[in-house]
Amino acid sequence: MSKVIIIGGGAAGMFAALGAVDAGHQVTILEQNEKLGKKIYITGKGRCNLTNACETSEIFENIPRNAKFLYSAIYGYDNFRVIDFFEEHGMPTKTERGNRVFPVSDHSSDVIATLQRTLKNKGVTVRLHTKAEHLEIEEGKVRGVKTSNGTTYPADAVIIATGGYSYQTTGSTGDGYRFAKKSGHTIAPLSPSLVPMTVKEDYCMPVSYTHLRAHETLSDL
């Protein structure tokens, strides 16, 4: 049984852990925060809009750039499989305006609880307050992960699931890019995806992260 270390215990890290353990591996999640899924708690205004019930092909129509890059990932585990996963593990869902899918309870904590319970039932080891510091690489292969407290976790494979740079207060500080670069990967230039817009002026910075329902009108010029 090979050992798989997953750096990061967010949504991607937890689902990666479930996939790895189902494939017969011994899995450990290293999470620097005090709990798993910290960013999940704040998604969908605390309700967790966990996926969309539209046809899978429609998802790509709403990705602003390089949608083809996501083809294999999304078709490999599409939005309907996500819904089925939570339903099968005891968390009913509902679909609202715009085909947005939420837990019936309207609590993002139920999404996390479902994932945590499934991880525990499948025997995944979780190490909280454990910050990955760097990868142990020998002869071009990753052999383990060294943490900030000096502990080294040996591994046959390492999955980087640290998130990007957004909402750094949740722990997304870009460590994954550093790990990937050290292991030989090339890092492409980063740019926003949710709102792919660059603004020259700085007067709009105070309204960053402000949500509102907007309307626009075009007149005959």
Feature locations, PLM:
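Residue-level detector of alpha-helix initiation sites
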Residues: 6, 10-11, 35, 164-166
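Short hydrophobic core segments
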Residues: 153-165
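Single conserved hydrophobic/aromatic residue that forms the stacking wall/gate
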Residues: 211-221
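Glycine-rich FAD pyrophosphate-binding loop
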Residues: 22-40
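Glycine-rich active-site loop/strand segments that organize a redox cofactor
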Residues: 47-93
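N-terminal Rossmann-like FAD-binding beta1-loop-alpha1 element of flavoenzymes
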Residues: 4-28
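Short beta-strand to alpha-helix junction loop
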Residues: 71-77, 99-116, 167-171
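A conserved short coil-to-beta-strand element within the FAD-binding core of flavoproteins
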Residues: 128-141
